[in-house]
Amino acid sequence: MVVVVVSSLIMEPAARAENEADIAEDIRFGDFNILAYRDSNNISPTTWYEPDNRSQAIPRIIKDNDWDVVNLQEVQTAFRRKDGSMTPSQIEDMRASADLSAYDFAATDKEGCNFSTSNPMPKIWMQPILYKSDKFALVTQGCFVMSQTPNDFSETSFGWPRNITSWARLRSKANSGEFYVFNTHIAANYGPIGGGGGGVPRQEWLNHQVDQANVLISQIKVINDENLPMMLSGDFNSTFETTPVSAAGTVLDSGLFIDSYNSAETVLTDGPTWNQLVEHGRFTGKIDHILIGEENSPVVTEYAVVPTMRKDADGTLHFASDHNAVSTHVILHWAPPEA
């Protein structure tokens, strides 16, 4: 497995803060679409167990990169096949992994944040937020649908399969500073429910993505009404350059966030975030993004695209996911408490 580990920078906090009295903390954020289990993709190079062992590779990537907080997309519970047998449970395999023993999980099925893409499909999907339990305490958590009625999980996303955003408010055990983490997944081009899943013309799909992005922006404003530091990441299924409209660009243009890639002082490793399950794909863009709340003068010191492919000596390829992970090292600031 090729793993990129984000290195620490040694620095004086006062050199980074606008005001020497500011409270600051270095945090490593990660984002990873792990590729939902399907029987159709449980073949090489993406088997969940042997021989590709995605169930072990994914936790190892998280541990080796030493993320303090990591957002995951496309995580599933077990579901019943037509023959009555059960599929593996990605979430339970991850909870049981020794490589993830340092993490607590927020916004999962245990908190009612599992969902179905459409009714009456089973509620097997979730977007967990993992955080190091020795560094942070969970204050509150939740999730919403990117739709006209965000708190109604019986509703679709504007007539399309449901897409959600999960979120958590965390408190630093080092300085008691609190911040929000938002974890999103914008629609792929499956088309409206009842359309057979074959997709729609590109413009219609992009417009739907922007509808979801606008809900995302409005809900973030409602939830983080105190303007605390925050991170938003996920699979946006769009680059900032996607034309004629871009969901990722719409969120960035809201003025709430800075992009960690374009703001980073150092880019350790670059490349596409969708690997297409090939060693050298034609797609070179980034559809997975880590955005940092613009308020409170955050500093992005490092950024990296983390490859999720490993190659055996005989040339055999194994993929933990069809996405590469994204990693960033950020210094968050809080205003000092009033005297």
Regions from the PLM with identified roles:
Residues 75-187, 305:
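Structured beta-strand-rich core segments of catalytic domains in phosphoester-bond hydrolases
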Residues 220-231, 238-339:
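Metal-dependent phosphoester-hydrolase catalytic domains
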